[in-house]
Regions:
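A short, Lys/Arg-rich alpha-helix, primarily the initiator
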Residues: 1-11
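Short, charged recognition helix plus adjacent turn
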Residues: 50, 60-74
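Short, conserved catalytic or interaction motifs in soluble domains
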Residues: 35, 54, 64
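Short alpha-helical DNA-recognition segment
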Residues: 14-32
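DNA major-groove recognition helix of helix-turn-helix/homeodomain DNA-binding modules
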Residues: 43-58
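Alpha-helical residues within the helix-turn-helix
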Residues: 10, 21, 50
Length: 74
């Protein structure tokens, strides 16, 4: 799963530590998410998106991009 957490975090002039405080997690978790080492829970993804003031689908995407979701049945 690709993500743009670092991009939006830097645009908001937030450190990893500050974003972690606002989102309710650790700085290490934000770092691991940014590096793609950890896929956040839905709850954590929503918390991060809220603090960065972006839609969660703009923050996280499947490897093929948004078009890849077209084949998923709900």
């Amino acid at each position: 799963m690709k993500n743009r957490v670092k991009l939006f975090r830097v645009m908001k002039n937030l450190s990893q530590r500050r974003l972690a405080e606002l989102a309710g997690c650790s700085q290490q978790e934000i770092s691991a998410i940014e590096k793609g080492e950890v896929i956040p829970t839905v709850y954590m993804a929503l918390c991060i998106a809220r603090q960065l003031e972006v839609k969660v689908e703009d923050l996280f995407m499947l490897e093929g991009g948004k078009d890849e979701r077209a084949g998923i049945l709900y």
